Amino acid sequence: MTLSPEKQHVRPRDAADNDPVAVARGLAEKWRATAVERDRAGGSATAEREDLRASGLLSLLVPREYGGWGADWPTAIEVVREIAAADGSLGHLFGYHLTNAPMIELIGSQEQEEHLYTQIAQNNWWTGNASSENNSHVLDWKVSATPTEDGGYVLNGTKHFCSGAKGSDLLFVFGVVQDDSPQQGAIIAAAIPTSRAGVTPNDDWAAIGMRQTDSGSTDFHNVKVEPDEVLGAPNAFVLAFIQSERGSLFAPIAQLIFANVYLGIAHGALDAAREYTRTQARPWTPAGIQQATEDPYTIRSYGEFTIALQGADAAAREAAHLLQTVWDKGDALTPEDRGELMVKVSGVKALATNAALNISSGVFEVIGARGTHPRYGFDRFWRNVRTHSLHDPVSYKIADVGKHTLNGQYPIPGFTS
C-alpha cells in the first residue's frame, strides 16, 4: 500500500506487556506538574505527545496480531480518563486518536486494517482528524474530492476543528465529490499521510479552553489520495449510518470517549481542589472552626461532588462494557444493538457533562477567593469542559434518552447520535 509516512517511531518492544492504565497514570503524574503553565502558554503539547508516542499507548486498541496492546474498550476508556484528569487537552488529543483509528476497521478493507494497524503499532503513529468544516451547518461540507482515472481523488479546500492534525502521522479526511461523474455529491473517506504534499495544518486554534489540542484548520491544496487510501466505496460511511451497520459505531464511540474526557477533567478538578482545601484554604471565622476541612458546607460540597462522579463513573463504565459487547458482534450488529448502545451513551454524555461543569465551577466555592489566582490554574478545568462540551448540544442527548423511554425510539444514526 502507499501509506508510508516518512517519520518512523519505533515502538517499545515490551509495551504491550505492561498495564496500560498504570502507564497512563505514570505519564499523568509527570504532566500534572506543568499543566497550568502549558495551559497558559497554549500552542502545541509537542513534548507530551512525544511522551505518549514513546509509551506505546498509541497502539492501545490495535489488535495483538498486528503488534498492538489489544486492549478492550473498558481499558481504553480508563486510559483516556487518567490522561484527562492530569490535562484536559492531552485527554482530548488521545481520545480523538482512539476515535480515529477504529475507522480503519469499521469501514476499511481487511488489507487496509492489517497494513495501517501494523504501521500504527510498529511506528507509533499519531492519527489526526480533518472532518468538520465551518460552513452553514455541521454537514455542509465543501472540501472537494475530484476523482482521478486511477481510482483515487484530489482534495481541495479547508477543514476546521482538526484536533490533533498538527503533529500527526496519519490523517483521516472526508471530501465531497464535486464533478459531473456518477459519484457527484458522494462523500468519500480516506486515510492519508499528514506529510502528503499540499496538506497544511495551520496554527490558528484559539478558544477559552482545550488550548493545546491544535484544533485549528487544515488546508488541502491539490492533495492526491491514492486508490488504496480510500476507506470504503463512495458514501460507505453515510450508508453505514443509514443501515445501522458497523461503521455507524463511530458515533457512540466518539461520544463515550468525549464523556470520559469530561469525567477525567472533573476528577482532576476535584483532586486539585481537595489538596488546596486541605493545605491552603482558610476557615470562615463565623463558622467557629479551626480548619477549612471542618466547615460543614465545604464537607457537604465535597460529598455532592463525589456522589455526582460516582454515578457518572458507574454509568460510563457500564456503557464501555456494552460497547465492547456490541463491538465483538462484528458484522452481526443489529439496529437494536446499535440503538441500545447509543441510548446508553447519550445518558452517560449528559451525566458527564453536567457533573463536570458543576464540579469544575463549584470547586471555587470550596477553595475560596485566594484560589482564583492564575498561578493555581483552577479555571482551566471549567474552560476545558465548557469548550469541548459545546461540540454537540447535550440537550439532544437527553431528548434521545427521553424518546426511547417514552416512545421506544432509538436515536437516528448520525455522526453524533
Curated annotation (Swiss-Prot):
**EC number(s) on file:** 1.14.14.21
Cite the annotated pathway.
Sulfur metabolism; dibenzothiophene degradation
Chief subcellular location = cytoplasm
Q: Reaction(s) catalyzed by this protein? A: dibenzothiophene + 2 FMNH2 + 2 O2 = dibenzothiophene 5,5-dioxide + 2 FMN + 2 H2O + 2 H(+); dibenzothiophene + FMNH2 + O2 = dibenzothiophene 5-oxide + FMN + H2O + H(+); dibenzothiophene 5-oxide + FMNH2 + O2 = dibenzothiophene 5,5-dioxide + FMN + H2O + H(+)
Q: Which residues bind dibenzothiophene?
A: H92, N129, W205
One GO cellular component term of this record is: cytoplasm
Does the entry feature the keyword Hydrolase, yes or no?
Answer: no
Q: From which residue to which does the signal peptide run?
A: none
Pfam families, from UniProt? Acyl-CoA_dh_2 (PF08028), Acyl-CoA_dh_M (PF02770), Acyl-CoA_dh_N (PF02771)
Annotated phenotype, changing D392N:
Very little production of DBTO2 from DBT
Task: State the UniProt keywords alphabetically.
Answer: Cytoplasm, Flavoprotein, FMN, Monooxygenase, Nucleotide-binding, Oxidoreductase
| Application in biotechnology | Can be used to remove sulfur from polycyclic aromatic sulfur compounds found in gasoline and diesel (biodesulfurization), which are a considerable source of pollution. As the substrates are not very soluble in conventional media, biphasic systems may help improve catalysis. Expression of dszD-dszA-dszB-dszC (cloned in this order) in organic-solvent-tolerant P.putida strain Idaho allows P.putida to grow on 10% p-xylene with DBT as the sole sulfur source.
Its subunit composition reads: Homotetramer formed of a dimer of dimers.
Q: What does this protein do?
A: Catalyzes the first step of the '4S' desulfurization pathway that removes covalently bound sulfur from dibenzothiophene (DBT) without breaking carbon-carbon bonds. Sulfur dioxygenase which converts DBT to DBT-sulfone (DBTO2 or DBT 5,5-dioxide) in a stepwise manner.
Q: Which family does it belong to?
A: Belongs to the DszC flavin monooxygenase family.
Q: What is known of its domains?
A: The lid loop assumes one of 2 conformations allowing opening and closing of the active site; in the 3D structure one dimer is open while the other is closed. Another structure with FMN (3X0Y) proposes a different lid loop that may interact with the loop predicted here.
Listed name of the protein: Dibenzothiophene monooxygenase
The scientific name of the source species is Rhodococcus erythropolis (strain XP)
Gene symbol of the encoding locus: dszC
